[in-house]
Amino acid sequence: MKVKNRKGRFDLRPDSPSNYRRVYVDVFSIAASLSQPEELFASAAEAGIRAVFVIDAWHETHLGLAQRYLDLCRRYGLDCRLSESKPAEAYAAELCDAECGEGCAVLTRDYDAVKAAGRCAVLIFRQGRFWRAAQEDLSEPG
């Protein structure tokens, strides 16, 4: 599937977080798409997925929800990191590249992660499923 938005042109192919040895989750982004955000934490714990949950905390407006998500991480025994100086999708991509690299992925709904990621895959959550995103070369006709 091809997607064009204000962030660029992207090629999306179906993929699954289970194809990666570790995933870095942009919590605010993914949780916002769920009717019950707690499902994100409960299902990850139940499935035993190796995940790092990256929580936006870089602006005071994030702090209340960030605390709620940190509490859920603790309740389910999950690895959570606060992103205190940049958006979580950028920090997740940075952490993924630094700690894991190839064979790992960032899970988000934000296409900025595609630009920020180096060696890690970026899976965009869209239409209830995950899609591996690659930015298309803007010099190619399209």
Residues covered by each model-derived region:
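Acidic, polar low-complexity linker/tail segments
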Residues: M1-N19
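Glycine-rich, flexible N-terminal cofactor/catalytic loop recognition
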Residues: S35
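Nuclease catalytic cores that cleave nucleic-acid phosphodiester bonds
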Residues: R13-P14, N19-V23, I30, E38-G142
